Swiss-Prot record:
NDH is composed of at least 16 different subunits, 5 of which are encoded in the nucleus. Gene3D superfamilies: NADH:ubiquinone oxidoreductase, 30kDa subunit. One of its GO terms (molecular function) is NADH dehydrogenase (ubiquinone) activity. The keyword NADP applies. This is NAD(P)H-quinone oxidoreductase subunit J, chloroplastic.
Amino acid sequence: MQGRLSAWLVKHGLIHRSLGFDYQGIETLQIKPEDWHSIAVILYIYGYNYLRSQCAYDVAPGGLLASVYHLTRIEYGVDQPEEVCIKVFSPRKNPRIPSVFWVWKGVDFQERESFDMLGISYDNHPRLKRILMPESWIGWPLRKDYIAPNFYEIQDAH
């Protein structure tokens, strides 16, 4: 079943794939990495002015990595704002997705966390560097094929 936003994107010739609706009835769409930045700008202009959250996950061992964006269309006088979930999949070997920092500034730390934990590189992000792990850390701890080291250096917190 095609949702309202999917129908609007089709009407305007914007390439995407409908993934249906989640358990709360929120429309979920898949966007290709190369189309993501331009569609993000279009969604912002269309009224999706609030990025509620961004996260990422490892789809399967050796498989794709996904970056997920939850957007809300906040309008004056509307009790129930329209929401959409966007999924952008990227290959594990060289995961690159355009950053939407310049569209929604609130994605800054969230994209950095996704980079730090899964190794997804967000192109044109102004400060893409590790945020949780030390700069010297090797690997991406939330990937399903990550092998944890058998030792951890405990650092003094003083």
